[in-house]
């Protein structure tokens, strides 16, 4: 499912116009992104949690030259599914 399909599904399920549903979907994405950017987390009971995980700096190798490369530390988004979502997916 891509974003347009998600917007259509939300519009149909919630009885909204597609433009209202698109605004709602965009707002949710914006809030999640802003919260994670501020290193916060979002916990949705029964669905899952969006958190920020820190990856430490490490050394890597360029596969074509074999030269050692420094890989900088960075923060990455992480999603952990909740029990309700796991149960829904598994049947």
Swiss-Prot record:
Keywords: DNA condensation, DNA-binding. SMART domains: BHL. Residues 57-91 are annotated as: Disordered. GO terms for molecular function: DNA binding; structural constituent of chromatin. GO terms for biological process: chromosome condensation. Belongs to the bacterial histone-like protein family. PANTHER family: DNA-BINDING PROTEIN HU, DNA-BINDING PROTEIN HU-BETA. Histone-like DNA-binding protein which is capable of wrapping DNA to stabilize it, and thus to prevent its denaturation under extreme environmental conditions. Binds to nod promoters and induces DNA binding. This is DNA-binding protein HRL53.
């Amino acid at each position: 499912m891509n974003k347009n399909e998600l917007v259509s599904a939300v519009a149909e399920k919630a009885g909204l116009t597609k433009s209202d549903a698109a605004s709602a979907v965009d707002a949710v994405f914006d809030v999640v992104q802003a919260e994670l950017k501020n290193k916060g987390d979002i916990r949705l009971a029964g669905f899952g949690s969006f958190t920020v995980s820190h990856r430490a700096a490490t050394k890597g190798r360029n596969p074509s030259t074999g030269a050692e490369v420094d890989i900088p530390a960075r923060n990455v988004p992480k999603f952990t599914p909740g029990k309700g979502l796991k149960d829904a997916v598994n049947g």
